Amino acid sequence: MPHAPARSGDAMSAAAPPCCTSLLGLSLSMFVAPCALAATPLEGAVVSAPAPTPPTPDLAYPELFQAVQRGELFDDQKHFVDFLPLRDPALINADYLAQHEHAGFDLRKFVDANFEESPPVQTDAIRQDTALREHIDALWPKLVRSQTNVPAHSSLLALPHPYVVPGGRFREVYYWDSYFTMLGLVKSGETTLSRQMLDNFAYLIDTYGHIPNGNRTYYLSRSQPPFFSYMVELQAGVEGEAVYQRYLPQLQKEYAYWMQGGDDLQPGQAARHVVRLADGSVLNRYWDERDTPRPEAWLHDTRTAAEAHDRPAADVYRDLRAGAESGWDYTSRWLADGKTLSTIRTTAIVPIDLNSLLYHLERTLAQACAHTGTACSQDYAALAQQRKQAIDAHLWNAAGYYADYDWQTRTLSNQVTAAALYPLFAGLASADHAKRTATSVRARLLRPGGLATTALKTGQQWDEPNGWAPLQWVAVDGLRRYGEDGLARTIGERFLTQVQALFAREHKLVEKYGLDADAAGGGGGEYALQDGFGWTNGVTLMLLNLYPSPGAIQAPAKTKRKPEPAAP
């Protein structure tokens, strides 16, 4: 993907090769993957060079693409970008240009004649009298996909091993979703599948230089919250410590991706994902290589940019894309006025969750290097310590919680969000900061159905009143690490009760939950509520293991709804 021009304050120099990277006075040239260790092929992985990646749908057939998205032929803007062109997209687009002004031209019929539709993931052909845990175990095969080869012109990226998709409209693997899914796979005894998913992500790093948002061409310009080191840690718990050495090359490449472009930054400048603060501290932000509307949400993005009268549309598009990379798409955390999407400024924010995850990556790299007996262990440990110091200096609010920092205005957020618990999850918080954060979270975010994402009602899906499975697990695991078992149990049991109540009523697990007493699915966002659902399944199994209350594991009431056959 081409790099877009820099905005003011961004030092967008050409990216240096990973071997030439330097940071905080420490030369990484000795221990970034291409220099230190040859990336040996993983067992069973596809090692031949992949076919050239086709252009994204908005570039492959631009006029047709815009006509379909602008005309709202489908309720969900993602639907069309997942369609398979039945012949050369350039020829399809040329035919569209030649025909679309003719009398009687029918755009929908033209699309139907030239594309194959991708159906949603079906998960409703499971017996209606299964208990929750049994239902989840039965769901895994429904969510598994194997795509070692893809048809020409598809937006899907091939992967060497089977993988689990979230469900519904999400027909591909997603980066940060997959960690929480893998937790459940391991708990279900599906350790081979969990290992295969980890190997898929290692393959993506080796092939594309990073783990994209998902295995689609239109996701390649960005990543998602970097959970690869947590996946390696999870697999080490299954196979043993040798796992760290096996994935060291990919861990190093992952780190190089997130730190790329940070060379020679002056205080107050940013490049790609890297920000150098006014005091010289180096932290990270979310970012995307492209500054155009997201193909999977094209109409939403163009309308949002049109409402931002005082900003270049390209800036709005990049901030929307960066918000998608954050996983929190969207939330008041990224909005200048705290409520209006057109004020989004994601790239101006140094997020507490992202930097906690990168601290864990640095610590994992130090551990992996220690297994090789190389000096890079001390170097990565030093980088982790410097990041911790920068987090304590800039992302700790004296009111008693971790928060996001706006590097452009040099202001710390006064908003308590579920992201405040990531430093506990990563193990970087001091005992005092952990205790004070727990107190703040209990006072501001505890709800009848679990942990609220934020305390603001904006209509965005990563705000009040929604609760999300991954954030419940980050909270529960992080709080337990620091002895806050009571609050952890309260959050975990309340969320389990919410999951069980909706399951008993509708026999499904969903992407997000409302946290009110009525135990409904969550709302807001750019698309309808999805069921399946990968990360909810995984977190539910983890919570059931910790808090196995009878009400959370009994079978739901029988329903008269007749199950439909599964899609092929």
Curated annotation (Swiss-Prot):
GO terms for cellular component: periplasmic space. One of its GO terms (biological process) is cellular hyperosmotic response. It catalyses: alpha,alpha-trehalose + H2O = alpha-D-glucose + beta-D-glucose. Residues 1-38 form the signal peptide. Substrate binds at R169, W176, D177, N213, R222, S223, Q224, R294, P295, E296, G327, E526. Belongs to the glycosyl hydrolase 37 family. This is Periplasmic trehalase. PANTHER family: TREHALASE. The keyword Amino-acid biosynthesis does not apply. It is found in: Periplasm. GO terms for molecular function: alpha,alpha-trehalase activity. Its EC number is 3.2.1.28. Its main location: periplasm. The active site is at D329, E511. The lineage of its organism: Bacteria, Pseudomonadati, Pseudomonadota, Gammaproteobacteria, Lysobacterales.
